[in-house]
């Protein structure tokens, strides 16, 4: 099949009976069966948003509220009322030093109209997992005496913030992360908490929390609003930002915007490549809408002076940024995932393999093979760009090992250039900038 010649004129030649049908899919209404994307604007975001206002709680109230919430989880009576309490406990999180809170603030006028003042219902939220075996374990440490009330308050809020990851994570995430949560609390706050060390959950309990967040828009809106506020308020170098980054930011930001998230990760490693050039290398005929959305984000939204709400907006309205989802860009998603796996340091557990997602695993093997070919070509293009772009980014060994040339430094008098007669060394694939001597050889990685 690969040897069959296809004449150029046949590619654009219509059959006689369909020669007038020049429409493309975009102009045929019935072809648009996908849910339409909602264009993101701050006003459109606020029109969709409802959230519960969080006010300051004292340590004794935090402790008693947690006891009631934990009892409801154990008894199967956990409701939207308890879910609101969970949000209130989470966003009463104290700063590591001093007495201030990280999230609570005076709500600005543009957001006041989004506050949901109605009392949540008390109907029990159903569990979506029947496993009632304890899936998280106690650390095994025992308390010596009564736990300090302020320490207990900080630990409860820290734990509740972690539970709000269930907005986007599965119960298994909490079960796997519980030891890390305990350790990080100790390192951030400089103290250990018996309450945090002894807490346990099962899948059924955690599934009620997740189901509640998915059911009640005001719950998602509350997580969105206070996360957005913290991201916009605390500078990158502060301890407050570091805590929020660990607890929420890294898990919630750019959720569902897989294409942009993986693109940023790759750019972090290929930092000398302009984003427009990288997009040119990786795009394909079906990626136009995703590329357009990325251009808009880079030009209008992903800027220091712009409110961070866009990063978390899909928690409020999941039709925002749909054109950046993996399901609408399966091929581009596979290319970026493979590039990330090969070039970006990966985490462990659920973060270990960016290609381990359904839309990629379900691809036909022939398509996966084509993706692998594209990825190899993109990496070769990058290597050639890195060396040919000049500067010191590509070291001598890096250039030599890839068969791409670098221009040598000018020769010095007395044969100090390292070659007899003062002739500059030729490196395979040299561009010829400032080089003398023999004509360059054909590059091994040239395209």
From Swiss-Prot:
Region annotation (Disordered) ranges: 401-447
GO molecular function (one): RNA binding
Single GO cellular component term: helical viral capsid
Keyword Transmembrane helix carried by entry: no
Annotated localization: Virion; Host cytoplasm
Main location as per UniProt: virion
Keyword NAD tagged: no
InterPro entries tied to this protein: Rhabdo_ncap_2 (IPR004902)
Record keywords: Capsid protein, Helical capsid protein, Host cytoplasm, Ribonucleoprotein, RNA-binding, Superantigen, Viral nucleoprotein, Virion
Subunit structure: Homomultimerizes to form the nucleocapsid. Binds to viral genomic RNA.
Role this protein plays: Encapsidates the genome, protecting it from nucleases. If expressed without protein P it binds non-specifically RNA and therefore can bind it's own mRNA. Interaction with protein P abolishes any non-specific RNA binding, and prevents phosphorylation. The soluble N-P complex encapsidates specifically the genomic RNA, with protein N protecting the genome like a pearl necklace. The encapsidated genomic RNA is termed the nucleocapsid (NC) and serves as template for viral transcription and replication. Protein N binds protein P in the NC through a different interaction, and can be phosphorylated.
Family: Belongs to the nucleorhabdovirus nucleocapsid protein family.
Protein name per the record: Nucleoprotein
Species of origin: Maize mosaic virus (isolate Maize/United States/Reed/2005)
């Amino acid at each position: 099949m690969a040897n069959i010649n296809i004449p150029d004129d046949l590619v654009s030649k219509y059959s006689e009976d369909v020669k007038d049908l020049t429409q493309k899919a975009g102009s045929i209404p019935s072809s648009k069966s996908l849910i339409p994307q909602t264009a993101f604007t701050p006003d459109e975001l606020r029109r969709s948003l409802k959230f519960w206002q969080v006010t300051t709680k004292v340590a004794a109230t935090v402790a008693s509220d947690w006891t009631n919430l934990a009892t409801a989880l154990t008894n199967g009576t956990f409701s939207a009322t308890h879910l609101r309490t969970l949000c209130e406990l989470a966003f009463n999180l104290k700063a590591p030093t001093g007495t201030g809170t990280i999230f609570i603030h005076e709500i600005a006028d543009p957001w006041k109209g989004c506050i949901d003042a109605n009392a949540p219902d008390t109907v029990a939220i159903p569990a979506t997992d029947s496993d009632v075996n304890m899936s998280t374990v106690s650390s095994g440490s025992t308390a010596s005496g009564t736990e300090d009330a302020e320490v207990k308050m900080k630990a409860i809020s820290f734990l509740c913030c972690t539970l709000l990851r269930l907005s986007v994570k599965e119960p298994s995430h909490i079960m796997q992360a519980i030891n890390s949560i305990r350790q990080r609390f100790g390192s951030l706050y400089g103290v250990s908490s018996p309450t945090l060390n002894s807490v346990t959950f099962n899948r059924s309990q955690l599934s009620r929390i997740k189901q509640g967040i998915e059911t009640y828009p005001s719950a998602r809106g509350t997580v969105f609003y206070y996360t957005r506020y913290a991201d916009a308020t605390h500078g990158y170098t502060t301890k407050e930002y570091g805590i929020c980054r660990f607890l929420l930011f890294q898990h919630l930001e750019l959720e569902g915007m897989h294409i942009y998230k993986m693109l940023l990760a790759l750019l972090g490693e290929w930092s000398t490549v302009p984003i427009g050039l990288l997009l040119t290398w990786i795009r394909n005929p079906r990626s136009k809408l995703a590329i357009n959305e990325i251009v808009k984000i880079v030009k209008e939204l992903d800027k220091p002076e712009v409110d961070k709400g866009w990063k978390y907006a899909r928690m409020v309205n999941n039709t925002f940024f749909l054109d950046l989802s993996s399901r609408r860009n399966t091929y581009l998603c596979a290319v970026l995932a493979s590039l990330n796996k090969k070039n970006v340091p990966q985490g462990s557990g659920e973060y270990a393999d960016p290609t381990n997602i359904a839309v990629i695993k379900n691809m036909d093997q022939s398509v996966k093979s084509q993706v692998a070919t594209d990825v190899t070509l993109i990496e070769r293009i990058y290597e050639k760009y890195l060396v040919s772009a000049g500067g010191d980014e590509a070291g001598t060994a890096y250039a030599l090992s890839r068969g791409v040339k670098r221009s040598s430094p000018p020769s010095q008098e007395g044969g100090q250039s390292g070659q007899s007669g003062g002739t500059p060394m030729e490196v395979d694939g040299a561009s010829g900038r400032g080089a003398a001597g023999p004509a360059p050889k054909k590059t091994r990685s040239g395209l």
